Amino acid sequence: MTRDIVITEVALRDGSHAINHQFTVEQVVEVASALDEANVPYIEVSHGDGLAGSSLQYGLSRTPELELIEAAVSVCKQAKVGVLLLPGIGTIKDLKTAAALGVGMARIATHATEADVSAQHIYQAKELGLTTAGFLMMAHMAAPEKLAEQARLMQSYGADVVYIVDSAGALLPDQAGERVRALKQCLHVPVGFHAHNNLSLAMANTLVAIQEGATWIDGSVRCLGAGAGNTQTEVLLAVLDRMGIQTGVDLYKMMDLAEDIVSPILQVPQEITRDALVLGYAGVYSSFRLHAERAARKFGIDSRDILIELGRRKVVGGQEDMIVDVAAEIAQRYSSTKIR
């Protein structure tokens, strides 16, 4: 089968953020089965923050992720199940455990300027026989030249593909294009792109990335992902078909999956709320939204103020504990102002 673009469906990983990591085995089986039947080549399954992400810091999973991964693997006849691993959260032991369950892909994620911490994890994933991707998160925080330098490191460690990851949904189309061009000029492995829709630019950025040569593309069915979600897979498939770009994925089956199976899972409609918009505007990690909203309720303040301050401080993924600290500081300032 010819695929001009390789689609990885991320709803069962990135979408975990949107539902507070409450996926059940039954939901994963139903979604993964439908994705496999639609001929999606890669399906990512894990806690939203990757292997071993279930914690007070990032959010506790309702169901142990290994059970979810095993369930997905058991129903996939052609698709490879993938996992995300952030060094420092997940370990090589976690990677080996996932591989033993039958996963076929590992994506090793670091901050955009910290590719060096991925070396042993990429090497181990390759040793385990997994399709291995480097995942450069918060890509808006690194200039194209810096991002290219980091991508070359991941390639040198053995990555089969390197992704530009717009974790905050902050990139504008020209910025997305610049970054893809920079990687295409210096890599011999394929370039991937992962978008978030916080500024309503996920589709535009993804199409620009494809036009600049990215061939591994992430989508999330029904837009189920952190913040305002990702590039909506079924919509992307329709657009690419109109453009004459082959994905090998069945559009009608993906539409049915979105409408009949994934839509009922959503706790609220996936839309660009004011907080999701501020994520993209301020350049804040998309999974911070629900954490900031909880902190705002606790301290009686505006969640947008928290997110704007986090953006000003350039807080990155893994610093979720800063959200409560910032909220407390803002609440103290509010209180001091009222006293005066």
From Swiss-Prot:
Substrate binds at residues 13-14, 167, 194, 285. One of its GO terms (molecular function) is 2-isopropylmalate synthase activity. Residues 5-255 form the Pyruvate carboxyltransferase domain. It catalyses: (S)-4-hydroxy-2-oxopentanoate = acetaldehyde + pyruvate. Keywords: Aromatic hydrocarbons catabolism, Lyase, Manganese, Metal-binding. The record marks 13 as: Transition state stabilizer. It comes from the Bacteria. The active site is at 17 (proton acceptor). This is 4-hydroxy-2-oxovalerate aldolase.
